[in-house]
């Protein structure tokens, strides 16, 4: 069998990626989240496939078909809530994965980092179109508000919005195409994941010390397969706890009301994992400015390699930048909270302050801190 896995064209690829892969001996549990994301993706594709067998992408029957899945299909409600809460687990793992990349300086692996940003954007697009499918109140109005933002694009905006809608409002054509997008995008994500891994295995993984670990590597199997397995079991435990005890805790009650274009909900908001970006969007009174800030809130990740002036790799031995990093994380949590609050004082003001902090910490304070640290250590 040893000869087989090293010689066979297909098994050889699997062997080089998951069995004999040379891995730094000191990577911590923060490196588990890549494999957890893979598991989340598999769960989402499988549960989504079974949901698609019973779902109908028609405005008159979409809401009823979701109710039918929950009531009449064997384990339908389990599959539906696994899919909905699986998306939340996916984004929790995704944010931790990106946060670990920032903390330990993984953005120096340029190709891997940039493909990761594309993956994040694609996943966000997938989650957004998926949220529209149950055709509840928040689905309809979320789709209307967010797609309408494209009308802020000068000259072509209005035409672009009508082109995406397939008419003059969010209607049957919109729902059908969103279902098509939601079905195809996870497979595009899977392809991008393979490219992400391809680039990662070209350079090898980063490690907590930030030093070159070529002299101290161990095979991925069995050391990290067993470690990943523990992470997967913990993930599944948390997911099943959510699904079986609190299936609706991360959802919106408004989505249990069928979509009604004549009745606007008191407070339109997206799913919790978009609230930080939504808060940044709302903090700018100008429509085009808000849209640009929304896009930049994600694309700013691409600036990390450019704004990295430190002579050290990662933040492990950089106390000033460490403090800034944790302020940034706290700020992100504040933005998430503000995104779910009504548009009124003091929430609007807090949102504006937090949005300014979000960008200034990354663009101004972190580069200044790294320069100060270089001077303190006389590494310049």
UniProtKB/Swiss-Prot annotation:
Xref: PROSITE patterns: CYTB_CTER (PS51003), CYTB_NTER (PS51002)
SUPFAM superfamilies membership: a domain/subunit of cytochrome bc1 complex (Ubiquinol-cytochrome c reductase), Transmembrane di-heme cytochromes
Cofactor(s) this protein requires: heme b
GO molecular function: metal ion binding; ubiquinol-cytochrome-c reductase activity
Cofactor: binding details: Binds 2 heme b groups non-covalently.
InterPro entries named among the record's database cross-references: Cyt_b/b6_C, Cyt_b/b6_C_sf, Cyt_b/b6_N, Cytb/b6-like_sf, Cytochrome_b, Cytochrome_b_C_euk/bac, Cytochrome_b_N_euk/bac, Di-haem_cyt_TM
Positions annotated to bind a ubiquinone: 201
GO cellular component, one term: mitochondrial inner membrane
Subcellular location: Mitochondrion inner membrane
Subunit structure: The cytochrome bc1 complex contains 11 subunits: 3 respiratory subunits (MT-CYB, CYC1 and UQCRFS1), 2 core proteins (UQCRC1 and UQCRC2) and 6 low-molecular weight proteins (UQCRH/QCR6, UQCRB/QCR7, UQCRQ/QCR8, UQCR10/QCR9, UQCR11/QCR10 and a cleavage product of UQCRFS1). This cytochrome bc1 complex then forms a dimer.
Biological role: Component of the ubiquinol-cytochrome c reductase complex (complex III or cytochrome b-c1 complex) that is part of the mitochondrial respiratory chain. The b-c1 complex mediates electron transfer from ubiquinol to cytochrome c. Contributes to the generation of a proton gradient across the mitochondrial membrane that is then used for ATP synthesis.
Family: Belongs to the cytochrome b family.
Descriptive protein name: Cytochrome b
UniProt gene name: MT-CYB
């Amino acid at each position: 069998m040893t000869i087989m896995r090293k010689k066979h064209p297909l098994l050889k690829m699997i062997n080089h990626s998951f069995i004999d892969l040379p891995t730094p001996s000191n990577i911590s549990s923060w490196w588990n989240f890549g494999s957890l994301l893979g598991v989340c993706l598999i769960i989402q594709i499988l549960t989504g496939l079974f949901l698609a067998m019973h779902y109908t992408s028609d405005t008159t029957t979409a809401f009823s078909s979701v109710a039918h899945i929950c009531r009449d299909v064997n384990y339908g409600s389990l599959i539906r809530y696994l899919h909905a809460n699986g998306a939340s687990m996916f984004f929790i793992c995704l944010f931790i994965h990106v946060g670990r990349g920032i903390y330990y300086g993984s953005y120096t692996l340029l190709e891997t980092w940039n493909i990761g940003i594309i993956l994040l954007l694609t996943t966000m697009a997938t989650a957004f179109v998926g949220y529209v499918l149950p055709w509840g109140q928040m689905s309809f109005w979320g789709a209307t508000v967010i797609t309408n933002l494209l009308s802020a694009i000068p000259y072509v905006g209005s035409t672009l919005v009508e082109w995406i809608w397939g008419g003059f409002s969010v209607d049957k054509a919109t729902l059908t195409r969103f279902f098509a997008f939601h079905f195809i995008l996870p497979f595009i994500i899977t392809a991008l994941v393979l490219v992400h891994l391809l680039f990662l295995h070209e350079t090898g993984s980063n490690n907590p010390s930030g030093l070159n670990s070529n002299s101290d590597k161990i095979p991925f199997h069995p050391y990290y397969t067993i470690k990943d397995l523990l992470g997967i079991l913990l993930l599944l435990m948390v997911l099943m706890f959510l699904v079986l005890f609190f299936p609706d805790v991360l959802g919106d009650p408004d989505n249990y009301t069928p979509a009604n274009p004549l009745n606007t909900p008191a407070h339109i908001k997206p799913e919790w994992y978009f609230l930080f970006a939504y808060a940044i969007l709302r903090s700018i009174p100008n429509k085009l400015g808000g849209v640009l800030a929304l896009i930049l809130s994600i694309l700013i990740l691409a600036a990390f390699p450019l704004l990295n002036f430190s002579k050290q790799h990662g933040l492990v031995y950089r106390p000033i930048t460490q403090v800034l990093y944790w302020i940034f994380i706290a700020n992100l949590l504040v933005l998430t909270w503000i995104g779910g609050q009504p548009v009124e004082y003091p929430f609007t003001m807090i949102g504006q302050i937090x949005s300014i902090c979000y960008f200034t910490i990354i663009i101004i304070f972190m580069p200044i801190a790294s320069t100060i640290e270089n001077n303190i250590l006389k590494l310049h």
